[in-house]
Swiss-Prot record:
GO terms for molecular function: DNA binding. Keywords: Activator, DNA-binding, Early protein, Transcription, Transcription regulation, Viral latency, Viral latency initiation and maintenance. The keyword Metal-binding does not apply. Residues 26-45 bind DNA. Belongs to the lambda phage cII protein family. Lambda-imm434 is a hybrid of bacteriophages 434 and lambda. The cII protein coding region is in the lambda portion of the imm434 genome. This is Transcriptional activator II. It holds the Pfam family Phage_CII. It comes from the Viruses. Acts as a transcriptional activator that allows virus to initiate a latent state. Following infection, participates, together with cIII, in activation of the Pe and Pi promoters, which are responsible for the transcription of the cI (repressor) and int (integrase) genes, respectively. Both of these gene products are required for the establishment of latency.
Length: 97
């Protein structure tokens, strides 16, 4: 059971890391790290799953604030929330029929 929980946590961490790389872009990530972009592609396949498991075993979670913010924005769009008017109540137009 503990192993399954760690595996699930590792998958969550791996997903967060891959999403961050995707949001930033492979080229920008490679430039920031100081490697070629092909190296980042190899890391995605070979190192990130292993590193994610290591982080899960060490109980070092990855907080993904950008993804949480994006999820809130998508939820607001899907629920079609209207923003409050930027005017005073007396300035709003009233129509009576």
């Amino acid at each position: 059971m503990v192993r399954a929980n760690k595996r699930n946590e590792a998958l969550r961490i791996e997903s967060a890391l891959l999403n961050k790389i995707a949001m930033l872009g492979t080229e920008k990530t490679a430039e920031a790290v100081g490697v070629d972009k092909s190296q980042i592609s190899r890391w995605k396949r070979d190192w990130i799953p292993k590193f994610s498991m290591l982080l899960a075993v060490l109980e070092w979670g990855v907080v993904d604030d950008d993804m949480a913010r994006l999820a809130r924005q998508v939820a607001a769009i899907l629920t079609n929330k209207k923003r409050p008017a930027a005017t005073e109540r007396s300035e709003q137009i009233q129509m009576e029929f």
